[in-house]
Amino acid sequence: MTRVFLTIDTELMWRHHVAGLDVDTIVARSLEPAGVGIAWQLAQLRRYGLKACFFVDPMPALVYGLDWVKRVVGAVLEAGQEVQLHLHPNWTRAKAGDGGANYAAFELIDYDWDEQIELIAGASDLLTSAGAPEPVAFRAGSYAASDDTLGALAELGFLYDSSHN
């Protein structure tokens, strides 16, 4: 039997933030686009008896609050699926309504060791604050991981990295 890992990056889309959309619209368009978002995916996983890992990026909570992350984490866990950590660092300087004018570097590889430790630890804290178990797996946004990322993950106790395309 062939084994596969079903993984789903779960994040708010930067392009909707840049377009200046309100948070409810950003959440809807990012997480439930065209009727095939998280709810549909969870229904299909349930229908076929499959398990998946949802890599959730909590960083937009720095801009839009934690409520939407709590809803995502709750829905995924209630469906018996797994939540792990995803991270797009550009959100650390974003501000609601700024049309994308304020942002940090988009790729994790553009941060040094200490900055990566701080970003990953902070994102992990946000995710657990939203109700997720302590994450043991990680996926960098844009799959942009470096040797520093792998070392930072090991230092922080992560067991798996999925930053590979």
Where on the chain are the PLM-derived regions?
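Catalytic alpha-helical scaffold of carbohydrate-active enzymes acting on polysaccharides/glycoconjugates
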Residues: 1-137, 143-165
